[in-house]
Amino acid sequence: MTSLRMAVRAHPTIAYLVLLFGGAWVLFLPALLGQSGIGLLAVDIPREPGLLLAVLAIMGGGSILVTWIADGGAAAKAFARRAIALRAGPQWYLLAIFGVPLLVLVAAVILRGPDALAPVAQNLAELPGGYLLPLIIAAVLINICEEMAWLSFLTDRWQERIGPLRASLAVAPLFGLLHIPLFFIVGGLADGRLPLSAFPEYAVLLLVVATVPVRILLTWVWNSTHKSLPLAAIFHQSIDMTAGAFMLATFYPGINGLWVYAALAVAALVVAVATRGRLGLPSRAGAAGAALAGAPVVVKV
């Protein structure tokens, strides 16, 4: 056994984080150096190829590879099968698709009164093509592999050791930090080029304000749905789209994207308190029973 393989087996999450940040940031580099980025290269290099490759190869493929090295082929196959695990009740799919838009609508009514309902009624026909279809496409192409890294690999390992709430809090700044290079790329974090003066605000937003409630809620959905990656991916993309320009302008005019994350923060606090920090994770006795039934419980970090 090589020393590298031994190191990965001893510390799989550290090994994966090195692969994740090193690989993803290298793939972000061409667009970052091009005219849509900081402009060191004379050509405009689109960001999409690097982003898609980072998601598919590093976040998805890399997490499977490290699982295979650390835990063996059977564990890697079980890990990969989570990408097609659909065994959750219909109420969870309704929550994943419509929960965040409805939460923001409630917040809009509280802020603006009953008039906030009018844009929704007037533009309801825009929902299938402007929200539902791109939601499913993006969840399948991007968010399943993305959450294979954050939920299925990192959170799932850490929550067995330090608990789901602490695991979510640990993953949150890492999730935000990975996105930092996108700040300097046109269209990376916003539709246009962000001024450097906005960097401190976006850094706080990425590292704390947006990511902490999002990771808490995603962990809750993950644990409550028998670790269904497709469902978690849909919920993740629903958050991104609801806070995006189309949904805000069409259904919530006058509501700033920060209010979306404020509403999510309230929801995350309610979930954390209601579940006593377990976020849907079975008790240790229940987890032991699952292990006896043949479900692997991985605790290596």
Protein language model annotation of sequence segments:
Residues T2-N143, V171, F184, L206, ...:
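Specific transmembrane helices
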Residues T13-L17, Y93, F153, A167-S168, ...:
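Alpha-helical transmembrane segments and their helix-entry boundary regions
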Residues G99, E147, A210-T211:
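Alpha-helical transmembrane segments of multi-pass membrane transport proteins
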Residues V106, L154, V214-L218:
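Hydrophobic/aromatic residues in alpha-helical transmembrane segments
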Residues C145-L177, N223-S228:
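Membrane-interface helix/loop boundary segments of multi-pass membrane proteins
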Residues A149, F153-W158, F184-F199:
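Membrane-interface interhelical connector segments
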Residues R193-A262:
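Functionally important transmembrane alpha-helices
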